[in-house]
Swiss-Prot record:
Pfam families: HTH_18, PBP1_XylR, Peripla_BP_3. Residues 288-386 form the HTH araC/xylS-type domain. This is Xylose operon regulatory protein. It comes from the Bacteria. Keywords: DNA-binding, Transcription, Transcription regulation. InterPro entries: Homeodomain-like_sf (IPR009057), HTH_AraC (IPR018060), HTH_AraC-typ_CS (IPR018062), LacI/GalR-like_sensor (IPR046335), Peripla_BP_I (IPR028082), Tscrpt_reg_AraC-type_HTH (IPR020449), XylR_PBP1 (IPR054031). One of its GO terms (biological process) is regulation of DNA-templated transcription. GO terms for molecular function: DNA-binding transcription factor activity; transcription cis-regulatory region binding.
C-alpha cells in the first residue's frame, strides 16, 4: 500500500538557534523514516499568520513558545504537534501533544557543572518577568527551587530587553549587581546571549572570569562563542531530539494512531565546559590577578617577566605563590593556556593550522607541531581529524 502524501507546515522562526535545531531534528526524522511529506516553510524562514489559511495543510509542527503561534492555532482542527519549554504546572500546557525542553533539567545540569568545579555560591541572571517568555520564568523558578532545596542563599538579577538607547545604563546596573556577589560565585545565565552580557560586564569592570566569578549559559549557540574573547561554557539542549520526536508523533497522528497528550520532556545533552567555568580554587589575590592577565595575554607571546612587570612584584615572590596555590610555575601556566587555546581552535573552528600557530603566539608551525605532539602524542592535524 502506497503511503499518502501530506502537506506539512513548520511554524518556526529560524532566526532563533532553538528553532533551527528543532527543524534539523524534524529533517532527521523525515530522512530516517522516508515519510511522504511535502514540507512548507516560508522562503525567509519566518512564517506569516495567513500561512495556514491560504494552504491546504494536513499537519503542523509549531513553536508554542511564540504567543502569536498559540493564538493562531488555539482553535485549529488540523493535526498539530506543539514544541516549547516545560511548565511546572501541568494545566499550563496546550491541548495538543507537546514535546518540551526540560527547563528544570537544564538548570540542574548547569548547577551540577558549577558544583563539580568546586563552587558553593550560585546566582542566576534572567529576564524581567514576561509571560511571553515563560521559559525564562520557569528557569528562574527552577533555580530558586534548587537553591531552597540545597539551603543556598539566592542571588537573582533580571535584566530588561537591551537596545542601543539603554545598553550602557543596563550594563552599569549589571556591574553593580556583579560587584555585590560573593567572590567565587557561579552564575547561571538564562541564555547564552545573557551570558555574553555577563562576560562583557565583567571585562569592562575588571572582574576576573573565572577566577572571581564563573559563568555558564544555556543553548550552546555557536554564534555567541565567536562574539566574546572568553569562551563560554554552556548547556546544550536536546533540540534536535525535540524535533525528531515531534515529527514522529505527527507521523503517528496522520496514520490514524492514538497519541498521548501527556507532555514529553526532553533532557539536555551535556555541558560544554570552556574557559568561563575553568575555575581553580585560588585564594591568593596576586595569583588571581596573574591568572587573569595570563588568560587574556598568553597568546600574545608574553614571557614571565611581563607578568611580573604588570603586577609589580618579584619573580621569587610570585613563583612561590604559584607553587603554593597551584603547584606549578608561571611558565607552565602560560604554556597550558596557549596549548589549551590551540586545542579549542582545532576542535571548534575551521581555521587553518598555520593561522592557529600565529593566533596562539607560536614562533613557527614546526615549533607548534613539536609542542603539540609532546603534549597530546599526536600532531595538530591528527587531533583535528579525531575530533
Amino acid at each position: 500500500m502506497t503511503e499518502q502524501y501530506y502537506k506539512i507546515a513548520l511554524l518556526f522562526n529560524a532566526n532563533k538557534v532553538y528553532d533551527r535545531q528543532v527543524v534539523e531534528g524534524i529533517g532527521q526524522y523525515i530522512q530516517a523514516s522516508q515519510c511522504m511529506w511535502d514540507i512548507f516553510v516560508e522562503d525567509e524562514f519566518i512564517y506569516h499568520t495567513d500561512t495556514i489559511n491560504q494552504l491546504s495543510i494536513d499537519g503542523i509542527i509549531a513553536d508554542f513558545d511564540d504567543p502569536k503561534t498559540v493564538e493562531l492555532l488555539q482553535h485549529t482542527l488540523i493535526p498539530t504537534i506543539a514544541v516549547g519549554g516545560s511548565y511546572k504546572q501541568a494545566d499550563f500546557y496546550p491541548h495538543f501533544p507537546y514535546i518540551a525542553t526540560d527547563n528544570m533539567a537544564l538548570v540542574e545540569m548547569a548547577l551540577s557543572h558549577l558544583q563539580e568545579k568546586g563552587l558553593s555560591q550560585f546566582a542566576f541572571y534572567g529576564l524581567q518577568v514576561n509571560t511571553h517568555k515563560h521559559w525564562s520564568i520557569e528557569r528562574r523558578d527552577a533555580f530558586v527551587e534548587l537553591m531552597e532545596k540545597n539551603h543556598y542563599p539566592i542571588y537573582l538579577y533580571e535584566g530588561v530587553q537591551v537596545h542601543a538607547q539603554n545598553w550602557l545604563e543596563e550594563q552599569q546596573k549589571l556591574i553593580v549587581w556583579l560587584k555585590s556577589l560573593p567572590s567565587h560565585t557561579g552564575i547561571i545565565a538564562v541564555t547564552d546571549a545573557r551570558a555574553r552580557h555577563l562576560l562583557q560586564a565583567c571585562e569592562y569592570s575588571k572582574i576576573a572570569v573565572p577566577e572571581e566569578l564563573c559563568v555558564v549559559g544555556i543553548d550552546n549557540e555557536e554564534l555567541i562563542q565567536y562574539l566574546s574573547r572568553m569562551s563560554l561554557s554552556s548547556v546544550e539542549q536536546g533540540t534536535r531530539e525535540i524535533g525528531y520526536q515531534a515529527a514522529k508523533l505527527l507521523h503517528k497522528l496522520l496514520n490514524g494512531q492514538k497519541v498521548s497528550h501527556t507532555p514529553i520532556l526532553i533532557p539536555p545533552i551535556t555541558v560544554h565546559s570552556r574557559n568561563s567555568t575553568d575555575y581553580r580554587s585560588l585564594t591568593d589575590p596576586l595569583v588571581i590577578q596573574a591568572m587573569h592577565y595570563i588568560r587574556h595575554r598568553a597568546c600574545h607571546r608574553i614571557k614571565v617577566g611581563q607578568v611580573l612587570d604588570h603586577l609589580e612584584t618579584s619573580r621569587s615572590n610570585l613563583e612561590q605563590r604559584f607553587k603554593n596555590e597551584m603547584n606549578k610555575t608561571i611558565h607552565q601556566v602560560i604554556h597550558e593556556e596557549k596549548i589549551s587555546r590551540a586545542k579549542n581552535l582545532l576542535q571548534q573552528t575551521d581555521i587553518s593550522i598555520k593561522e592557529i600557530t600565529e593566533i596562539c603566539g607560536y614562533p613557527s608551525i614546526q615549533y607548534f607541531y613539536s609542542v603539540f605532539k609532546k603534549e597530546f602524542e599526536m600532531t595538530p592535524k591528527e587531533f583535528r581529524l579525531n575530533c
